Amino acid sequence: MRQNGLSLSISIKHIIMINNYSLSDISSQVRRDIVRMVNMAASGHPGGSLSSTDILTVLFFSEMNHDPKVWRRDGKGKDMFFLSAGHLSPVFYSVLARSGYFPVSELASFRKQGSRLQGHPSVERGLPGVHVASGSLGQGLSVACGAAITKRLSGEENFVYVLCGDGESEEGQIWEAAMFAAHNKLSRLIAITDWNGQQIDGPTDSVMSLGDLEAKWKAFGWEVIVADGHDLDAISAAYKQAKAGSQNGKPKMILMKTHMGMNVDFMQGTHHWHGKAPNADQTANALSQLKETIGDF
């Protein structure tokens, strides 16, 4: 994978700045952003944001057709991304800012009163990159289905991406949307599950087992791709495979195997950091494990 050959859909000025960094560099900086944002706000969800960092870094900086400088809320003429697991807003905001949708300095306003960067993404204050407010868990896949149908009816051949959580997949609306997408042959819909095995109350297998998740999605009529959600090459290959099947009549589900709190040793692999802000000492510890590459906000 050409880790320095970042998406040409991003504005030329921004490419000149960001192209000096590999996807690994960007991913490390995004993780630092997440830790600092949640610490500064004394609130937020670091665990799942850290587990999905590599997934969104590859998508926004390598695989998705988007342009921050000509962004439209209706997504016309470009790929669209929806964050169904809205509590993962720290990673979403960081990736948007680092992509050039809004100033990186604005990350410091996360969860502040009057900020455009609320705990769950909203459209009230017109934050570029956010097409729709995140609702209750389970709703985003349905929204993405609607966007995919709209693009088909409009004659567009762009892709629609949506990120869901594995805990979120316990919601019934996910499976209603799964049936809808398969029935309507939404082959340009690419859903991603951050499969970290943890949710707010504990391991997903203990709270409510999803069983054989791969077999389940296949049984619902989806093409299923399983990948290591922390291997940048594997993530890129998964996206490419999903896009290559755009004419096969099947929606795509990429099951990304990840670790909650990835790359921060005391957060990694435990549900205790699902929605907990690190204190000053914990933040310093976490940042010592994450290389500053592009520069902190």
Stretch-by-stretch model annotation:
Residues 4-16:
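Short, Lys/Arg-enriched N-terminal segments with co-localized hydrophobic residues
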Residues 27-43, 194-196:
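N-terminal capping segment at the start of a domain
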Residues 34-38, 49-183:
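Cofactor-binding active-site loop characterized by glycine-rich and histidine/acidic residues
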Residues 54, 87-88, 196-197, 257-261:
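Glycine-rich beta-alpha junction loops
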Residues 79-81, 158-162, 189, 248-256:
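Generic beta-sheet signal
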Residues 127-129, 133-136, 141-245:
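Thiamine diphosphate
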Residues 232, 238-297:
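Glycine/aspartate-rich loop-and-adjacent alpha/beta segment that forms the canonical ThDP
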